[in-house]
């Protein structure tokens, strides 16, 4: 169980999701916030989104400020430390703090930095294969992430694929991307097919179900129709998962051991 000793009513947590135009795509973050708030008791927890929907980061910090919060712990709920984590979120926080006197902040690591995410990925893969009988031939494993032009993001995904490969005693777990980076998802699947496997397993590196997971499943369905002799398996997104509450609390506790400051633009 995570230790909660240092949290109080004047220290709030701002949980920053990406945001979706589809209301159903934003509900998992709200549910996660309710779980974190229940765990922490008197500590205010506020959801917000970087883009596409509300509340915005500015609205989220302002809400915490009105609730008497003097110190805000900002938790980026992103799986990789791309531009959103390193620039966009701090920039928006800085703009907001310029209007909020006497509020200080600290930033946690992004969600994907928590080691439990690897365990969650392992759980989703095990669930996807639970009802599948063993196959006599070879299996190709594909890890597909959002994608970014940022080489650091690409490196994170490649490292995760290596960890998954090692933990699962899998010969090869091939990383690929939906956009803005190579290898692309489509090219990776074509390569997997060319190796004439008995089964192809696709693991989406996505936090929650939504438009991108539907896109992945659609691509797999088309190829399954084209190559019916191959067994195709697609795992679910990482969440919802009760362990995400522990991840957020762990990251927040680690971050608050740093100094709070005013992050101004």
Which positions does each model-derived feature cover?
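Active-site-proximal alpha-helix that buttresses catalytic centers in soluble enzyme cores
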Residues: 1-265
């Amino acid at each position: 169980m995570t230790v909660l000793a240092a949290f109080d009513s004047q220290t709030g947590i701002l949980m920053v999701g990406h945001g979706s135009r589809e209301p159903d795509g934003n509900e998992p973050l709200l549910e996660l916030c309710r779980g974190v708030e229940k765990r922490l008791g008197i500590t205010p927890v506020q959801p917000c989104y970087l883009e596409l929907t509300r509340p915005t980061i500015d609205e989220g910090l302002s809400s915490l400020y009105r609730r008497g919060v003097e110190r805000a712990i900002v938790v980026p709920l992103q799986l990789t430390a791309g531009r959103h984590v390193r620039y966009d979120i701090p920039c928006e926080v800085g703009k907001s703090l310029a209007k909020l006197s006497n509020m200080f902040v600290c930033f946690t690591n992004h969600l994907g930095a928590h080691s439990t995410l690897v365990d969650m990925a392992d759980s989703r893969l095990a669930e996807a294969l639970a009802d599948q009988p063993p196959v006599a031939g070879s299996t190709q494993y594909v890890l597909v992430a959002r994608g970014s032009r940022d080489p650091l993001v690409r490196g994170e995904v490649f490292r995760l694929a290596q960890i998954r490969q090692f933990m699962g005693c899998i010969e090869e777990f091939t990383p690929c991307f939906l956009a803005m980076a190579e290898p692309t998802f489509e090219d990776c699947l074509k390569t997997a097919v060319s190796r004439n496997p008995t089964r192809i397993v696709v693991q989406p590196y996505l936090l929650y179900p939504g438009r991108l997971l539907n896109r992945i499943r659609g691509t797999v369905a088309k190829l399954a129709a084209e190559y019916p002799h191959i067994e195709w398996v697609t795992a679910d997104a990482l969440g919802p998962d009760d362990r995400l509450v522990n991840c957020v609390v762990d990251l927040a506790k680690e971050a608050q051991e740093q100094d709070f400051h005013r992050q101004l633009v």
